[in-house]
């Protein structure tokens, strides 16, 4: 039977959180990849791309891999019990529970990060301990069957790491080559540790409203989990 891989799809998802890992994992042999949401109505990503679910919470098969991407829409998801219940149910049966970027905050709101090493987008890293996680500032972090990827583009690194676990290093390397994944960006500003201070300051300024809102939501989620 084909390996069942499911990505949570939701309004205001960060499309690269989803489509980067999707391309990697959908390129593996003998897999079936699902885009899962409450219904089959297309959703709009945070940058305006229309994405169509392929199955619903009700009809989704038992998944071998569940992946929660991040994006502007994670705040509402963290307080959406229908979504959290679906994630918990699938996570209890899945071989691997995974996330990209701020999708790890949703896993945390579902109670799946307690005592676990995890990562997320750098701007929201300090929220992880509130959800019981042990924060690690790596692009990909594994703790048992939990894989979390850092911000946005780290999703490709995450997916290749998971691909190696699923099908072996040779096939994972083949997929990497087929996708010509050999990053060589023109600037060394992809991390707050290497970006110019003025760029970091501007990025933090732009993230501040979202950080404030997500901090409040994270505190409420922690209270529901009796972590506060």
Curated annotation (Swiss-Prot):
Keyword Coiled coil: no
Source taxon at top rank: Bacteria
Effect of substituting residue 79 to Q: Almost no change in activity
Enzyme class label: lyase
Function: Catalyzes the hydration of cyclohexyl isocyanide to N-cyclohexylformamide. Acts on various isonitriles, but not on nitriles or amides. Probably involved in detoxification.
Note in the entry: Does not require metal ion for activity.
Protein name according to UniProt: Isonitrile hydratase
Annotated source species: Pseudomonas putida
